[in-house]
Amino acid sequence: MEPRCPPPCGCCERLVLNVAGLRFETRARTLGRFPDTLLGDPARRGRFYDDARREYFFDRHRPSFDAVLYYYQSGGRLRRPAHVPLDVFLEEVAFYGLGAAALARLREDEGCPVPPERPLPRRAFARQLWLLFEFPESSQAARVLAVVSVLVILVSIVVFCLETLPDFRDDRDGTGLAAAAAAGPFPAPLNGSSQMPGNPPRLPFNDPFFVVETLCICWFSFELLVRLLVCPSKAIFFKNVMNLIDFVAILPYFVALGTELARQRGVGQQAMSLAILRVIRLVRVFRIFKLSRHSKGLQILGQTLRASMRELGLLIFFLFIGVVLFSSAVYFAEVDRVDSHFTSIPESFWWAVVTMTTVGYGDMAPVTVGGKIVGSLCAIAGVLTISLPVPVIVSNFSYFYHRETEGEEAGMFSHVDMQPCGPLEGKANGGLVDGEVPELPPPLWAPPGKHLVTEV
């Protein structure tokens, strides 16, 4: 049994807390376990005391207060009620001032990361340019600039795809600058007809695809250069994955341009230039990831994959085991067949992968009874292996998607200002002076894309 307090002590006093019409009763000793919080500090709590009803009144979210009061009763255990949205509960926790440690544990339990601060440049002109290119939601001009950037990205991707069509592709392997590297002294025209020695050769710089590509690269380079010059921190800028993607998007053009100029001057080997340009052309396809800067859906997909790396790793590991196991089994089951496609275990890897992923091209198929049994088991094992981690990945996607939508809805609403019930004399022990309204702490949670901004 707990020792009883002497009569003069007020720690056993029963307090009535009225939260939006719902009355709670507890002891002052319970709230006093955390004296740095709003309810644990008598001076701060007294601002909300109603003398007429002899109770403390808080016009706040009622379902959240059960967990807040349990935090005091349990000695520091904070659990969000299942029917309370995360952003609403975090606002209530911030209002009652339960502390950074409790919020950190809650974020860890909920899997809610702290939004990183996005610094702003000190100079006004640099700050305007940074907001214009980095924050599309900051102004109407920034939205227009984002639309232009998306259109340029789409044009670049369309050109990348169109130049591989037979009607536009030369007989040589490659297009644009890569095509010229293999063309020799007499490149073929766009219509595919043969180029006679008497006709002037078509240089790659006159190619319409090259012109459009050059215009797109000029825009990408200008955009990247402006953001690099006005960014508040060069270290943070180069650590950003999106900025690295922007750099990779323009790098192939300049490498291909330098290779082509060197080829025309007779510097370097033509075969080596063609090999380099083929790799460079493949890198150009990564330009499509620039759209993720302007697409919330791609950002949510990236967050889902990042949060599901463990499950994806297990999936790849299970597939690896299954591929080795079933490719070995089908090889020994079909080894006696003269016309067998399974000539070795490595040759059977392709069949095992296609079968376990339930694609089934049919280019390789077992013929013997034993091989068919192995194929059936391989297909069943593939279905089970792939289906196991899928619910976890879907759950992660649903979590990030709802967090994004709830964050957008939260920005449309604001709380009614809490007005204390009466004045409090002095400001001792953390109290407030007469007429002062307690301020809410700064926002401790923000949806993806809504970051705190500070000047550096």
Swiss-Prot record:
Please tell me which stretches of this chain the record labels as motif Selectivity filter.
358-363
Tissues/organs with expression? Highly expressed in skeletal muscle, heart and kidney.
Which GO terms of the molecular function aspect are on file?
A: delayed rectifier potassium channel activity
Topological relation to the membrane, as annotated? Multi-pass membrane protein
List the SMART domains.
BTB
Q: Which reaction does it catalyse?
A: K(+)(in) = K(+)(out)
Per the record, the domain of life is Eukaryota
What residues bear carbohydrate chains?
A: N191
Instruction: Tell me which CDD domains the record gives.
Output: BTB_POZ_KCNA7
Membrane spanning residue stretches: 144-164, 209-229, 241-261, 276-295, 312-332, 373-393
One GO BP on record is: action potential
The entry's free-text remark on domains says: The N-terminus may be important in determining the rate of inactivation of the channel while the tail may play a role in modulation of channel activity and/or targeting of the channel to specific subcellular compartments.
Family note: Belongs to the potassium channel family. A (Shaker) (TC 1.A.1.2) subfamily. Kv1.7/KCNA7 sub-subfamily.
The UniProt function text for this chain reads: Mediates the voltage-dependent potassium ion permeability of excitable membranes. Assuming opened or closed conformations in response to the voltage difference across the membrane, the protein forms a potassium-selective channel through which potassium ions may pass in accordance with their electrochemical gradient.
What name does UniProt use for this protein?
A: Potassium voltage-gated channel subfamily A member 7
What organism does the UniProt record list as the source? Answer: Homo sapiens (Human)
Q: What is the lineage of its organism?
A: Eukaryota, Metazoa, Chordata, Craniata, Vertebrata
